[in-house]
Amino acid sequence: FMMVDDFWGEAEWHDFYGAIKQVFPDREPVELPYEHPIFHCVYDLPNKPQIPSLGAAQAGRSRGITWERSDAQEVHYKGIFDDKGRMMVMVCHNTDLGDGWEREGQDPWYFKEFSEKLAYPLGINIVFYAMTH
């Protein structure tokens, strides 16, 4: 199981897509709907969360902006599946789960809003899903 995280916008998507097609030339990333178990299996998330980097969160805090650039406003969670329907790759585009996991000691507001409520629960769901499917 591989998880890809923290790449934003169209240019970085195209770079990723070109690279992953070299690994899986016959597989397409499929958008995961909100109803997918990965968003509900342990923690029932209220939506498909967009976790900004710490810097982007601080810069956009007063306006409620969670994206890092204008072409990255919509979060995408995609999966690449094997022939038996098992997810091999989880793609987290236009979001930064890693910052939600690693920046908890740097800003109490960021920790409460993004780490506790979104990044940790989704991370636990991803690990649980990967280990049980």
Where are these regions (language model features)?
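Mature catalytic domains of secreted/periplasmic carbohydrate-active enzymes
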Residues: 1-133
